[in-house]
């Protein structure tokens, strides 16, 4: 059974490692040392729920609801554009320290809501957990399926806590004005790139539905 566990662990790591909205948010909270472990836990728990839903039957709902997929896609596009704009606005702010100070004054609930939006409004999360993991895990018997799910869940917990702790450890070097400007530019550019990719997919989905 450990074979299925390590298969899930490897696949989960491969899907979670690329820079995306979740990773960028966890990294920034780690650099600020602002509720970073709480955010890592909430991201990992969100992944746990999505992984279990995808592997244990939720993929059928998404595949049978193309309009739901289109709605999630365009909601994600709107959010990523706004998130990227905020990062770029901070990067090119004349007073970067003032902009960072305003971010540091955000309350816990605002940070939690942003994290939930980053996770649950990202269509790639549903494609990864419902389509990829759902199609692979759905082919397994009950016991191997549980070990496969446990492996992918382990990858999420290890990655998010590792990223948050590493970012907090490197915070003294990454809190400089130059480093913060570079990080915000990269995050903003990546968010907009993902948003435009999703928009193309969203247009294709709508065209397919209307034909």
UniProtKB/Swiss-Prot annotation:
Keywords: Amino-acid transport, Cell inner membrane, Cell membrane, Membrane, Transmembrane, Transmembrane helix, Transport. InterPro entries: Arg_export_ArgO_enterobac, LeuE-type, Lys/arg_exporter. It is found in: Cell inner membrane. It holds the Pfam family LysE. The lineage of its organism: Bacteria, Pseudomonadati, Pseudomonadota, Gammaproteobacteria, Enterobacterales. One of its GO terms (cellular component) is plasma membrane. The chain crosses the membrane at residues 1-21, 37-57, 68-88, 111-131, 147-167, 179-199. PANTHER family: ARGININE EXPORTER PROTEIN ARGO, ARGININE EXPORTER PROTEIN ARGO-RELATED. It comes from the Bacteria. Signal peptide: none annotated. Involved in the export of arginine. Important to control the intracellular level of arginine and the correct balance between arginine and lysine. It is a multi-pass membrane protein. GO terms for molecular function: L-arginine transmembrane transporter activity. It comes from Klebsiella pneumoniae subsp. pneumoniae (strain ATCC 700721 / MGH 78578). Belongs to the LysE/ArgO transporter (TC 2.A.75) family. It catalyses: L-arginine(in) = L-arginine(out). This is Arginine exporter protein ArgO. Disulfide bonds: none annotated.
């Amino acid at each position: 059974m450990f074979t299925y566990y390590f298969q899930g662990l490897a696949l989960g790591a491969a899907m979670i490692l690329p820079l995306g909205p979740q990773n960028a948010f966890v990294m920034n909270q780690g650099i600020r040392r602002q509720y970073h472990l709480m955010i890592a836990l909430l991201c990992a728990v969100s992944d746990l729920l999505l992984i279990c839903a995808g592997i244990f039957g939720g993929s059928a709902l998404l595949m049978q609801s193309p309009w739901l997929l289109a709605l999630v896609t365009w909601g994600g596009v709107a959010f990523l554009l706004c998130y990227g704009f905020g990062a770029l606005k901070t990067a090119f702010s004349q007073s970067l320290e003032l902009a960072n100070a305003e971010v540091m004054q955000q309350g816990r609930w605002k940070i939690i809501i942003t994290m939930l939006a980053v996770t649950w409004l990202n269509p790639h999360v549903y494609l990864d957990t419902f389509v990829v993991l759902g199609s692979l895990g759905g082919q397994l018997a009950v016991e191997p399926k549980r070990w496969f799910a446990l492996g992918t869940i382990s990858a999420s917990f290890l990655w998010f806590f590792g990223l948050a702790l590493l970012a907090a450890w490197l915070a003294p070097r990454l809190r400089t004005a130059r480093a913060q400007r570079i990080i915000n530019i990269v995050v903003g550019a990546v968010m907009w790139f993902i948003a435009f990719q999703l928009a193309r997919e969203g247009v294709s989905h709508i065209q397919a539905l209307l034909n």
